[in-house]
């Protein structure tokens, strides 16, 4: 049976225009028609299941670009990671993907979880055993010996070892590769202000990942780490915090490198919402506390990058302390209210731009005939008030109705 979604307006993800009185027709797992409600035929309506949302907005499903689905998102998340069993991680992961889907995330990229967890979970979602978003996985992140996330990462120091680690993840079925190019605040004893790999090692990693058809995302806080990643041709920078090697200087923003990021088409996931949520939830020291020690300066840097043409994508770092799996809507909210871009620009980052970063823009990211039927109906108008994204009324993921008129069906 066909499915017809009707709402007061539509944001298709590819245009800055809002289309009034819109309808989306879905057949199986695919969008077959996008039109005004007046263009729907009597036969289409008679043969279809119709969901009509007065006051609502049709838009593409959210794309969460940065998650760790085996992590707890609780205040003692690091303790959980270092003490729990793979069986517990699987249970946490199954809850995480369900929670994400229930909040409107229809595509989710995991950027570092145990191989024994993410690959079985991806298969379970694909086979319909458990509900979840389309799950794209890196498996274990690649890090140096004792480096950031070493407790669940693959430790590799030389170019040869890093390339071997990439090939192993490819053999297991990874959708992309994650490498820790600098230290991180979540892992005790690592240095967020210093690189873990030189640019030649990263270059060799990128070259082999590209040979295998895989894109590479790099965790980077230190400015020197950012420089190394850009020089090496990393596809996606995660955090991109521009931290100075001198703690007293805090940031060491390099506009020339920002221009190179824009020119090379490198996507940036600034994980903006994590510190915002820590502040809301009363935690002062955060995994990225160094990156947001001066939030106004951080947002000033990001605004400058935006104006230079850098493309931003939407990652929560969900699973890390206080970053819950149903928190996605805070990302575009912070992009609008703190970074200063428009609601429509933030929505495009969360849909179309993120799909392009994944190399899946022929399949997801916009409401276009022929693409996957990943469609939300928002109660309200997020093009005017971005906070409306918290009010997801209806969710369709790959043609299946997950939530209808506020009622969760999974």
Each model region followed by its residue ranges:
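C-terminal cap of metal-dependent C-N hydrolases
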Residues: 8, 12, 350-352, 356, ...
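Active-site mouth loops of central-metabolism enzymes
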Residues: 78-91, 147-164, 215-220
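Divalent metal-dependent hydrolysis catalytic cores, especially in the metallo-beta-lactamase
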Residues: 92-118, 132-143, 174-187, 214-215, ...
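Active-site gating/metal-coordination segments in enzymes
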Residues: 146-203, 238, 242
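Active-site core of metal-dependent hydrolases
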Residues: 187-297, 313, 318-320, 340, ...
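His/Asp/Glu-enriched, well-ordered alpha-helical/loop segment
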Residues: 211, 286, 295-381
